[in-house]
Amino acid sequence: MYYFPVSALLIEYLILTIVDSRDSYGYEISQTIKIVADIKESTLYPILKKLEKGGYVTTYSQEFQGRKRKYYSITEAGKEQLVFLNQEWNSYRDTIDGIIEGRIRN
């Protein structure tokens, strides 16, 4: 499968979308994003840290099969950011569709 390049902002949007539906741990998030983007954990974790520092997600640890997993949970600020990013994504997608369909020309 060919993957289109993705930006850090798009990864942030995907992360917030994933943790908005339910709290998730890093590996689970990365595997979901890998459906559409060829990212490495070394790319994902700094973005998760940035979202945490920005107050968009919080973390907690939970034991699973004898090991601790770090879970990410969306905050109210994260929900607000998700609404904003969703609007931006829809606008971007509509513009791309317009170019593809020939409705938008320079």
Language-model-detected regions and their locations in the chain:
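Amphipathic alpha-helical dimerization/coiled-coil segments
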Residues: V83-N106
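Basic, amphipathic "hinge/linker" alpha-helix immediately C-terminal to the N-terminal HTH DNA-binding motif
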Residues: F64-N86
